[in-house]
Amino acid sequence: METKMEIEFTKKPYIEDVGPLKIKSINFSVLSDLEVMKAAEVQVWNIGLYDHSFKPYENGLLDPRMGPPNKKSICTTCEGNFQNCPGHYGYLKLDLPVYNVGYFNFILDILKCICKRCSNMLLDEKLYEDHLRKMRNPRMEPLKKTELAKAVVKKCSTMASQRIITCKKCGYLNGMVKKIAAQFGIGISHDRSKIHGGEIDECKSAISHTKQSTAAINPLTYVLDPNLVLGLFKRMSDKDCELLYIAYRPENLIITCMLVPPLSIRPSVMIGGIQSNENDLTARLKQIILGNASLHKILSQPTSSPKNMQVWDTVQIEVARYINSEVRGCQNQPEEHPLSGILQRLKGKGGRFRANLSGKRVEFTGRTVISPDPNLKITEVGIPILMAQILTFPECVSRHNIEKLRQCVRNGPNKYPGARNVRYPDGSSRTLVGDYRKRIADELAIGCIVDRHLQEGDVVLFNRQPSLHRMSIMCHRARIMPWRTLRFNESVCNPYNADFDGDEMNMHVPQTEEARTEAITLMGVQNNLCTPKNGEILVASTQDFLTSSFLITRKDTFYDRAAFSLICSYMGDGMDSIDLPTPTILKPIELWTGKQIFSVLLRPNASIRVYVTLNVKEKNFKKGEHGFDETMCINDGWVYFRNSELISGQLGKATLGNGNKDGLYSILLRDYNSHAAAVCMNRLAKLSARWIGIHGFSIGIDDVQPGEELSKERKDSIQFGYDQCHRKIEEFNRGNLQLKAGLDGAKSLEAEITGILNTIREATGKACMSGLHWRNSPLIMSQCGSKGSPINISQMVACVGQQTVNGHRAPDGFIDRSLPHFPRMSKSPAAKGFVANSFYSGLTATEFFFHTMGGREGLVDTAVKTASTGYMSRRLMKALEDLLVHYDNTVRNASGCILQFTYGDDGMDPALMEGKDGAPLNFNRLFLKVQATCPPRSHHTYLSSEELSQKFEEELVRHDKSRVCTDAFVKSLREFVSLLGVKSASPPQVLYKASGVTDKQLEVFVKICVFRYREKKIEAGTAIGTIGAQSIGEPGTQMTLKTFHFAGVASMNITQGVPRINEIINASKNISTPVISAELENPLELTSARWVKGRIEKTTLGQVAESIEVLMTSTSASVRIILDNKIIEEACLSITPWSVKNSILKTPRIKLNDNDIRVLDTGLDITPVVDKSRAHFNLHNLKNVLPNIIVNGIKTVERVVVAEDMDKSKQIDGKTKWKLFVEGTNLLAVMGTPGINGRTTTSNNVVEVSKTLGIEAARTTIIDEIGTVMGNHGMSIDIRHMMLLADVMTYRGEVLGIQRTGIQKMDKSVLMQASFERTGDHLFSAAASGKVDNIEGVTECVIMGIPMKLGTGILKVLQRTDDLPKLKYGPDPIIS
């Protein structure tokens, strides 16, 4: 029996709907004349716009074939109306060619390389073939090809600048090609003035017979007009174009036929039906048609005239202005109302790229003033009813919500909760106005969409500008409330950097269920409690919440049952069950402490299994004299929670505030989840607001009123300080002042006086803090960290202190004094800006003036800084936006280049780091938790040191079978466990077994560590580039622009803050304060350090010479130099008369022979051979030059300072270590100086380090320098972000700055570069070179409206859920 074959097709015979097409890539090109004509629908030549009946002229600029000219018209090409017709092109034929100003530099570069008669390349044949072979290499990147083409142009232009180049094909003499001067318009000149001998006459004769002679500037320099250049370009071979990296024929770079853009991008606006207002582009095109018509008329005449050239130049300028209205060469024709060109529409902040494509205005948004509301949850935002009635959400009708939506429809748009519109499945819609609402509601069917008012629980996005980091826009749930402001919990102020002094915020309503889901998952407040900058918590309690917590948890706060129960009820919504803890005092009455309130807040009842264990040192922590037990702190500053019970401590900012990884909310988040932390924040906000409202807390003038004792103490301190200052001033005037290292007398005096005056303020501040009552409101706020510091209090109560301008005392702005109220040359504290009064006692007129000087500096600094940091952040974002982590753990950019094999060397997520300095876990705290939750039991075994190590290795193998943990993490964990072994082996613990480690504790500890480490791995698709850029850019706004004193060296000011960050990321070659930190081979001996300093520091002859004088007698004339041996010995300099002689002979400016200099015992005699008549002049000139000759050290080094090494970890047997700080450059020479340890010597100049030590050393320098700057400003940024930035700057083998030239070399796409800076240059360059943009990066995807390939967009492959159809070809063959 024959088996019937069954065939099932893998593909369907046809597909009805393929879905919308996506743009895969963009190919940039230059259109030829034929392509322009093919693309156009109509030829434009008519100068008129409308006829007398206001109908557009045919073949005019408003021809209806190019699209409807206004809203009432119809397109005659596609029959579309104003909304539907995309527009159609026209074309304008020019009678004479003109330069395309966008490609002007390309045209110039081509002309530099070709013969001006036969179009042959001027390059040597061997060089030509070599460069062409490189250019044809398929593996060569477009960036390298551009560089190669530039090298060819540079070679040809260099040859032309040195000599006349003779063409090897036709023998024509080619000179330099350059742009003509701006006053002559737009053109190119050919300069052949370097022709020599008999060639000149021949050349002049040849030029006199050419047409170009009329435009000649001089006989050997003539203008290459576009017609001539067009002919040259047409004769060029394709090989030559390939060598110059021009993808299309070069004649296309010259305009002979122009595209006229469609009317949709240059609409005509009718005003009152009697006149029209035309677009700038239409006005420009009208001028071009007018000029072309004049040119046509002139050319049609039998004889040519100079007028021909003038009209041609006019057309050239008009075409150039049409493309770019800011083009050079048009200054001689100023315009009353400047019209913008095509390029002006694209470039800048208001251009198409940045204003309409990269970002755009959106609907369904609201904006109003913000207010605080502690009764709202941190995940909620209070929205005014008025706003909720305007903003809508399209809800689809289903059987679950039909009745609710019917009621909304009945209510209509003006009654809340209502609806504004109903959309039906057939595409029609009805607006809910009038009396038809009831009928529409009754007819409402499943499948309809109702645009209903915003309701409680709807998902909204909340944003405050400036949006400096990811947490500046987060997702909240709507809570509809009366009044007119947006409200939210104050705990969420930090991420938005919001305050309530009139700030406004924006709100966006996502319009699809997918968008809502994505928003609540990725952008929800509870999922963004920590900042990815360094893993610190950002959403935390602030101000009043901290004050009330501090007061509630005082040792002397007690509550009876009624009061305690009432306070506990403040926390929740009255729905939570609360288990009252055992009272602290039972007799004579049951009393509970304030600390127990926080135990209830953390764990209201037994069903909530939250067990928090933590130790925190608060601001007012003071170590006891014996230092045995921290919990016995006299100020109750040691906060200790054990299993969610507060044992000791007054809670303040360190425990409840932001910026602490060991705070209460951080631990709730890490040990449990974000919900546990959010719930505790909500409870504390409600409790604090209600408690402080009833308890009362205010600040008044009597809080800053000093007592009699304090006033006397302050007066004595100030008088004592003034006396010290006057003594120092007298010492300075007598010349007896002891100088400080590296400083002269005046600077030493300033340093001394500043130190004394700072001591006055500190002394008065201490007296003030100790003299205030503990109930003093400013003191309470300072201690708990809610607002202010001891300095603020001491300025209000005791003494304002020294006012500084640019880090110095008040300068002498008047004649030899700061103000006319003081004597001349006065250095006294009062004359130089010291304010002895407090804000309470009031400032005198002069003190007030000095105080405003200091205040002005702060204001100016802030204003300048805002623009500087904003631009810095934008550059960082553009450079790093494409970087993401892939599934193979590598960090790559949009084009697939690997920047890091593992993100941050360990693949950890910075937002989840628990330890200091980016460590994944805090082992001490974790072990404390394990000890609390897993106490020793009778069946547990205590481990000795050896058993501990052995058990650890076993547990590690058991829990980390897949080897997820890195070697560095395992090493740090092993070190911690070994330290536990040392502790448990000490005698007291062995005796009592109180701090011993049991087997169960170790097992649980290792398990938790491995599990948590695994959880902290960064997810594939994370946009780490964007996060890194924001993490570096956002702290920049908090920095100052001032310079700081270098670490430990008062005399050495180095650039810090925003200017220093800019220097680093710009990869500046010449930084403002280059410093080399040089380690010594013998760091313990100061004499040795001074000797090495003498070898490095630049020393001039004038510094070590006792005298330099001219000796003239009747028989001889010479210059005698006497060296000062005392100075040479004190400075440990190795300078001798012989070494001075060699230095003089090596100086290029002084032309002396060996015989002219005679060495004496203590100096030299210089007798130059000169003409007697000029001897006097020459010797005095030599005398003036000699003091500046460098006789010792490195010439690029300005100064060397010997300083104490402040790093205590490097000290040997407690002895002081010395090092050198070298102010200047030439790292290589410093490293090679005898006595310097070159292996540990570093520089802060990134480019110099790169040249001296290589690219890896430069990468390390970038990381270290950014870390140092941030550290000096008290900011911590995860090192992984800095490593990523350093890798981006160095991954191509050279240090690339994060600015326009550096980003250009970073293999970025055309659209990205065009959206950054120099829009026109990048687009024209891409077109000339025929570049292809593959739409891979973030900017390109946003511009094209395509999902970007990061985050969820990284997924490319999906698992098939259906089985593939099987192909049945009958039974298997029987093989015999």
Curated annotation (Swiss-Prot):
Reactions catalysed according to its record: RNA(n) + a ribonucleoside 5'-triphosphate = RNA(n+1) + diphosphate
Annotated CDD domains: RNAP_III_Rpc1_C (cd02736), RNAP_III_RPC1_N (cd02583)
GO biological process: DNA-templated transcription
Enzyme category, top tier: transferase
Gene Ontology CC terms, in alphabetical order: DNA-directed RNA polymerase complex; mitochondrion; nucleus; plastid
Record flagged with keyword rRNA processing: no
Cellular compartment(s): Nucleus
Single GO molecular function: DNA binding
Positions of Zn(2+) 2 binding: C115, C118, C170
UniProt xrefs under PANTHER family: DNA-DIRECTED RNA POLYMERASE SUBUNIT BETA' N-TERMINAL SECTION (PTHR48446:SF1)
Protein name: DNA-directed RNA polymerase III subunit 1
Organism of derivation: Arabidopsis thaliana (Mouse-ear cress)
